[in-house]
């Protein structure tokens, strides 16, 4: 069986990354979103194993000590991370795995899994991004300014990625994301094992 491929997708907050990834994976049994571990409290409506794997701080730090994570970060008082086994189990079935992480996490993943494919999603304009942040949050001007600063910092790392998509028209951006996945599945490296019998017959 051909091993699946890991996709790393990053974007500033408000660029529509989560909506695009959800739409990409909807009805696609050969694609799976990797579920992260976190120490933050479970919120109403969240399902363990679907939204996050919820663990306490001691368990998370034990996993860090055991080098169990592809990537992890501490955000304010909580840890977030992607376990190696979570991704490896998906890839071993031949399915592709999708990680939604920031540029720092993406950099960690590339060091451990250099064959991963990375995509950065940009908003159509700075004004559109600010408007999306205002629409999503009932925050003060100071908080919105900090969010914009964080978004600009995230976007400054776009050149570290393999592909760039601008999410202006959602359906167009989704089709571009699908095209990236389809293109990767048609490489000789991935097609040759699947087409082994055909190739042997054609060349025999």
UniProtKB/Swiss-Prot annotation:
Annotated Gene Ontology MF terms? Answer: ATP binding; guanylate kinase activity
Q: Which CDD domains match?
A: GMPK
Which Pfam family, an example, fits this chain?
Answer: Guanylate_kin
Family under the similarity heading: Belongs to the guanylate kinase family.
Q: Which UniProt keywords apply?
A: ATP-binding, Cytoplasm, Kinase, Nucleotide-binding, Transferase
Q: What is this protein called?
A: Guanylate kinase
Q: Where in the cell is it found?
A: Cytoplasm
Role summary? Essential for recycling GMP and indirectly, cGMP.
Catalytic activity, as annotated: GMP + ATP = GDP + ADP
Q: Does the keyword Membrane apply?
A: no
Gene3D superfamilies (alphabetical)? Guanylate Kinase phosphate binding domain, P-loop containing nucleotide triphosphate hydrolases
**In terms of domain of life, where is this protein from?**
Bacteria
Q: Name one GO cellular component term.
A: cytosol
Recorded coiled-coil stretches:
none
Residues crossing the lipid bilayer are none
Kindly give the SMART domains that the UniProt entry links to this protein: GuKc (SM00072)
Which PROSITE patterns does UniProt cross-reference here? GUANYLATE_KINASE_1 (PS00856), GUANYLATE_KINASE_2 (PS50052)
What species is this protein from?
A: Methylococcus capsulatus (strain ATCC 33009 / NCIMB 11132 / Bath)
Q: Which HAMAP family match?
A: Guanylate_kinase
What is this enzyme's EC?
2.7.4.8
């Amino acid at each position: 069986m051909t091993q699946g491929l890991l996709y790393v997708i990053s974007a500033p907050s408000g660029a529509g990354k989560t909506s695009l990834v959800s739409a990409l994976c909807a009805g696609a049994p050969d694609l799976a979103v990797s579920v992260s571990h976190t120490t933050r409290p479970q919120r109403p409506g969240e399902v363990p194993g679907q939204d996050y794997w919820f663990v306490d701080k001691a368990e998370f730090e034990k996993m860090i000590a055991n080098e169990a994570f592809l990537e992890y970060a501490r955000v304010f008082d909580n840890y977030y991370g992607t376990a190696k086994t979570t991704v490896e189990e998906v890839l071993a079935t031949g399915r592709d795995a999708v990680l939604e992480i920031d540029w720092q996490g993406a950099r960690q993943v590339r060091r451990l899994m250099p064959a991963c494919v990375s995509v950065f999603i940009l908003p159509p304009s700075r004004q559109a991004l600010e408007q999306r942040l205002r629409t999503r949050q009932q925050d003060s001007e100071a908080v919105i300014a900090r969010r914009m600063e964080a978004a600009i910092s995230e976007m400054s790392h776009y050149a570290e990625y393999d592909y760039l998509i601008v999410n202006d028209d959602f359906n167009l951006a989704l089709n571009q994301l699908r095209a990236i996945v389809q293109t990767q599945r048609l490489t000789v490296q991935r097609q040759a094992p699947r087409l082994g019998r055909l190739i042997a017959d054609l060349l025999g």
